[in-house]
């Protein structure tokens, strides 16, 4: 993946926090398959926008606003994924191809 949107970063952070409990920028870079400098740049932007708390070499945290947005985005994404699987009977393999 060449680039990712703010939505991708927020959903990725949310997912990793659900799975691991905490997230480092390197974890997010690996998860999104993006370079660490690109992740750092976007995290600085998200920090300026008041969505995440980002300090170099420390764990990432959502602000309450960022957490709420990430939660809603993740919920919407999961609803769509469930619809594709359960109603349209699209196989997981095909969903994963177009997931992001």
Describe every region a protein language model picked out.
Residues 78-100:
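Amphipathic alpha-helical dimerization/coiled-coil segments
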Residues 58-77:
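Basic, amphipathic "hinge/linker" alpha-helix immediately C-terminal to the N-terminal HTH DNA-binding motif
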Residues 43-44:
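Short, hydrophobic-biased segments on the C-terminal half of alpha helices
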Residues 2-34:
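N-terminal helix-turn-helix DNA-binding core of bacterial DNA-binding proteins
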Residues 47-55:
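A short, conserved structural fragment
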Residues 37:
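Key DNA-contact positions within bacterial/archaeal DNA-binding proteins
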């Amino acid at each position: 993946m060449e680039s990712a949107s703010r939505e991708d970063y927020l959903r990725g952070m949310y997912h990793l926090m659900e799975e691991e409990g905490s997230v480092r920028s390197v974890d997010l870079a690996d998860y999104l398959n993006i370079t660490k400098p690109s992740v750092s740049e976007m995290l600085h932007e998200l920090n300026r926008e008041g969505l995440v708390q980002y300090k170099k070499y420390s764990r990432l945290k959502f602000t309450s606003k960022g957490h709420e947005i990430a939660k809603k985005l993740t919920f919407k994404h999961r609803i769509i994924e469930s619809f594709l699987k359960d109603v349209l009977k699209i196989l997981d393999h095909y969903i994963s191809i177009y997931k992001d």
